[in-house]
Amino acid sequence: MNNVQLVQWINTLIRHHNIKAFYNSALWEHVRLEILEEQHYECQMCKAKGSYSPAEAVHHIKFLKQHPELALTKSNLMCLCKECHY
C-alpha cells in the first residue's frame, strides 16, 4: 500500500468511526514494534524528565485524524507509558 492509498484508507476509517481497524492492522503493528524496539520500550516523556517507565503505547505526536499522511512516519511516533499516554 503506498502513502496515497494509506491516507485514503485512514480517511475512510475516520469517516466510518472505525479507526480501530488501523490500530489492529499488520501495517501498524509492524511499525509499532519497530518503534518500541528502537526506543528500548522506554517512555520518552519520562525519559526527558530523567526517570524510567516502561512504554506500553506508541503515540502519534501529530494526531492521526489530523495528519493521516504521517500514520507510519517514525519521526511522528514516540513510546509512552500508561500514565503519559492520554
Regions found by a protein language model. Name each.
Residues 29-39, 70-74:
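Short, flexible, mixed-charge glycine/proline-rich loop motifs
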